Curated annotation (Swiss-Prot):
Catalytic residues as annotated in Swiss-Prot or TrEMBL: 43 (proton acceptor), 70 (proton acceptor), 191 (proton donor)
Name this polypeptide is given: Pyridoxine 5'-phosphate synthase
Gene source species: Solidesulfovibrio magneticus (strain ATCC 700980 / DSM 13731 / RS-1) (Desulfovibrio magneticus)
SUPFAM superfamilies attached to this UniProt entry: Pyridoxine 5'-phosphate synthase
Keyword line: Cytoplasm, Pyridoxine biosynthesis, Transferase
Residues bound to 3-amino-2-oxopropyl phosphate: 7, 18, 192, 213-214
């Protein structure tokens, strides 16, 4: 069955709203694991707007499952990844003005640059995932640069304004999953997934992991992190491998 990876960035967002010490994303990660999360995700942005270096360090020392580090493909972040040794790195595009990641990484056209970057991580035993749109060109380029996984960007599906638009985006995703698998890539899905729209994938094989953050943290504010995570786990547990 596919696994649930919980992103705790938005716990840090609440903390940073008051420049306080709580709520602590490290504590939230521990509770997410108690609820059944099989991995914890944090995005260490260049501007450190939510997750900070301390969070990555303490999470690496304390979580019992797996740590996935989302980051831009910069030299600074490469140094941090090589030092902290996350279980996976997911390379994402990054703009300082954006509220959240707005689209997939443009891998096509940057193959040589990204291949060298991915190789440095691989030499340290760190597999790389690339956060991409469900586009055949990006999938083929991801394979070419040596990525182990792709995370298909589900944001356009989640944000679609009409049923027809949502179906169009879902069809793109459903076509991209087997294409990526045929290239030997592992497939994760993430961005904008919640307790309702996740059911669109209930009969979809080939997904290794669902990456979910905001909807779980939003529910956790009202019901607690353990309940919020366990409810999502119960949904995903019924999905095919």
């Amino acid at each position: 069955m596919p696994l649930l990876a919980v992103n705790v960035d938005h716990v840090a967002t609440i903390r940073q709203a008051r420049l306080a010490k709580s709520p602590d994303p490290v504590a939230a990660a521990a509770l997410a694991e108690l609820g059944g999360a099989r991995a914890i995700i944090v995005h260490l942005r260049e501007d450190r707007r939510h997750i900070g270096d301390r969070d990555v360090h303490v999470l690496r020392e304390t979580i019992k499952t797996r740590l996935h580090l989302e980051m831009a493909a910069t030299e600074e972040m490469l140094g941090i990844a090589l030092k902290r040794k996350p279980d996976m790195v997911c390379l994402v595009p990054e703009k300082r003005q954006e509220l959240t990641t707005e689209g997939g990484l443009g891998v096509a056209g940057r193959e040589a640059e990204l291949a060298a970057y991915v190789a440095k991580l691989a030499e340290a035993g760190i597999p790389t995932s690339l956060f991409i749109d469900p586009d055949p060109r990006q999938i083929e380029a991801s394979k070419a640069v040596g990525a182990a996984y792709v995370e298909l960007h589900t944001g356009a599906f989640a944000d679609a304004a009409t049923p027809a638009a949502r179906q169009k985006e879902l069809d793109r995703l459903l076509a991209a999953i087997p294409l990526a698998k045929s290239q030997g890539l592992g497939v994760n899905l993430g961005h904008g997934l919640d307790y309702d729209n996740i059911y669109a994938f209930k009969d979809t094989p080939g997904v290794s992991e669902y990456s979910i953050g905001h909807s779980i943290v939003a529910r956790a504010v009202l019901t607690g992190m353990v309940e919020a995570v366990s409810t999502m786990c119960a949904i995903i547990d019924g999905f095919p491998d």
